[in-house]
Amino acid sequence: MKKKVLFVIESLSGGGAEKVLTTIVKNIDKTKFDITVLTIVKTGIYVEEIEKKCTLISMLPEYEKLTNPIAKMKYKVDYKKIYKEDCAKIYKKYVKNVYDVEIAFVEGFATKLVASSWNRNSKKIAWVHVDLIRRAYADEYFL
């Protein structure tokens, strides 16, 4: 039986963590793993590559593709609301499946979201891609 794996990352922009995630998704054994990537925003240079290789769930659509001014305003409100809302509520709203492994692929919000998972049986991993001593902004996410 395949292991169900969830990766959580804020976007698929052109950073190093996004490239590493894309490489993992492209090369992981699909006979052993069923991969889902959850992003806050559906944006970045790796979106198409990820969509070809696994399930991609995005909390918000691609802002660039919104043409209606009201939709753009709603997007901005929803974006701010996601970061202010209780992570357990956000998790419950967007993560509908049960996963064997849940991986926060960057520090910060993704880590808080995975830590808020209601699934007690999943293995949870926080994959940190920065030097936390030099990145003081990350302090608020850790004890």
Residue ranges with predicted function:
Residues D86-A88, Y94, V101-N121, I133-R135:
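An aromatic- and histidine-rich active-site surface loop
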Residues F7-G14, N27, T31-Y79:
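N-terminal strand-loop element at the rim of the active site
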Residues G15-T23:
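A conserved mid-protein helix/loop that constitutes part of the nucleotide-sugar donor-binding site
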Residues P69-V101, E140:
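An amphipathic, basic-hydrophobic alpha-helix
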